[in-house]
């Protein structure tokens, strides 16, 4: 059983603030969760194969092909506004000042 003091310490570490009447409920809930975890820890899983996929479907694989291309022209085609021409020339995005 998790005590009220332990529950308050856990809440403080998690940067949570509870009213005094909620701390008891919190400690009860944490105790329940810890009991569930202890039950799971007692299960013998030595002979069970680890699950590698939730579905039995095989992933479709494709060959990786290396291509060399300069996508910057396509990227800067999407720039609009007054700075579009300059952005395409210098190959930088021009944004409004965000830091003083």
UniProtKB/Swiss-Prot annotation:
Q: Which superkingdom does the taxonomy of this entry point to?
A: Bacteria
> Reaction catalysed?
L-glutamyl-tRNA(Gln) + L-glutamine + ATP + H2O = L-glutaminyl-tRNA(Gln) + L-glutamate + ADP + phosphate + H(+); L-aspartyl-tRNA(Asn) + L-glutamine + ATP + H2O = L-asparaginyl-tRNA(Asn) + L-glutamate + ADP + phosphate + 2 H(+)
Q: Name one GO biological process term.
A: regulation of translational fidelity
Going by the UniProt record, its keywords in alphabetical order are: ATP-binding, Ligase, Nucleotide-binding, Protein biosynthesis
Q: Would the keyword Transcription turn up in this protein's UniProt record?
A: no
Q: What is stated as this protein's family in its record?
A: Belongs to the GatC family.
Q: Which Pfam families match?
A: GatC (PF02686)
Species: Rickettsia typhi (strain ATCC VR-144 / Wilmington)
| Subunit comment | Heterotrimer of A, B and C subunits.
Question: So what does this one do?
Answer: Allows the formation of correctly charged Asn-tRNA(Asn) or Gln-tRNA(Gln) through the transamidation of misacylated Asp-tRNA(Asn) or Glu-tRNA(Gln) in organisms which lack either or both of asparaginyl-tRNA or glutaminyl-tRNA synthetases. The reaction takes place in the presence of glutamine and ATP through an activated phospho-Asp-tRNA(Asn) or phospho-Glu-tRNA(Gln).
This enzyme's EC code(s): 6.3.5.-
Name by which UniProt lists this protein = Aspartyl/glutamyl-tRNA(Asn/Gln) amidotransferase subunit C
Recorded GO molecular functions are:
asparaginyl-tRNA synthase (glutamine-hydrolyzing) activity; ATP binding; glutaminyl-tRNA synthase (glutamine-hydrolyzing) activity
